[in-house]
A protein has these predicted regions:
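Polar/charged low-complexity regulatory segments
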Residues: 1-132
Length: 132
């Protein structure tokens, strides 16, 4: 899952690597010995992108973009942060699949910096730092 304003960076990186425009939500691209399976879809009302590739340089380039998923308050706008609780149901699925791979790679110091840089409620800051 990717923030909507970061999708263009991802697409540009892929298009540059494979010298082709992404024109649909599902695509397979090949260039020399590199192959990419690209699938863009909606989940939890947000854009998700599934990428399978054997191109290590592309993986490194995507990793260097420091893409991040949308915040829980964006994905679940009609829920009070206090109802997120112990990560059950759809919140647990979203957390495990989309948020934790991003959040888990940050040190505690970087997590603290992240929540301070965002315009988050105190409850959301506390929730994110609690689920370290």
């Amino acid at each position: 899952m990717i923030k909507s304003d970061e999708l263009a960076k991802l697409v540009d990186t892929i298009e540059e690597r494979f010298n082709k425009k992404i024109t649909s939500n599902k695509a397979i691209y090949s260039l020399k010995n590199s192959t990419l399976h690209y699938y863009q879809f909606k989940e939890f009302g947000q854009t998700a992108v599934d990428i399978i590739t054997n191109d290590n340089n592309l993986i490194d380039n995507i990793y260097a973009l420091y893409l991040e998923p949308p915040l829980p308050s964006t994905v679940f706008p009609n829920r009070d942060v206090e109802t997120f609780g112990s990560l059950q149901g759809d919140i647990e699925a979203w957390w495990s699949i989309y948020w934790h791979p991003f959040w888990g790679r940050l040190s505690l110091e970087k997590k603290k910096h992240y929540v301070e840089q965002k315009n988050l409620s105190n409850e959301l800051k506390e929730f994110l730092l609690l689920h370290n």
